[in-house]
C-alpha cells in the first residue's frame, strides 16, 4: 500500500502476521519513527544555527507497550551528545526536542473527520 503526500510516495505494508509480506514499515511504525526523526531534525536545526557539528549526535527512541491493550504507554528518547558538545546548550537541546511537531500533535490531537464518498 502506498500513500502519496506532498509529492512523496510512502510505502507501507503489514507484517506477515497480519496478512502483509513485511516489505515495508507498517503505518504505526512510521508514526513511531516520525517522533524520533522529528526530534532529530529539531536538534540538527538547533545545532546548525549555532555552527555546532552534528556528525556525532545520535537520537535513540524506545517505547514500552502494554501487552494487554497493545498500546504504547511510554516513549523514551535519548539524545547522545559527543563530549565536545557545548555544555551551555545541553538543556536547550532538550527544550528544542520537546517542541517536536509530532509530539505536540499527540498532546493536542486534531479532530478526525472520516467519511465515505
Spell out what each predicted region is:
Residues 41:
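Short glycine/serine/threonine-rich phosphate/pyrophosphate-binding segments
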Residues 1-33, 44-117:
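Extended beta-strand/beta-hairpin segments
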Amino acid at each position: 500500500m502506498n500513500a502519496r503526500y506532498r509529492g512523496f510516495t510512502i510505502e507501507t505494508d503489514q507484517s506477515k502476521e497480519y496478512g502483509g509480506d513485511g516489505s515495508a514499515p507498517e503505518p504505526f511504525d512510521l508514526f513511531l519513527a516520525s517522533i524520533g526523526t522529528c526530534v532529530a531534525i529539531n536538534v540538527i536545526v538547533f545545532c546548525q544555527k549555532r555552527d555546532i557539528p552534528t556528525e556525532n549526535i545520535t537520537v535513540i527512541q524506545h517505547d514500552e507497550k502494554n501487552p494487554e491493550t497493545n498500546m504504547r504507554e511510554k516513549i523514551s528518547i535519548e539524545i547522545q551528545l559527543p563530549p565536545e558538545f557545548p555544555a551551555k546548550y545541553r538543556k536547550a537541546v532538550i527544550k528544542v526536542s520537546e517542541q517536536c511537531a509530532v509530539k505536540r500533535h499527540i498532546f493536542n490531537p486534531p479532530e478526525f473527520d472520516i467519511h465515505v464518498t
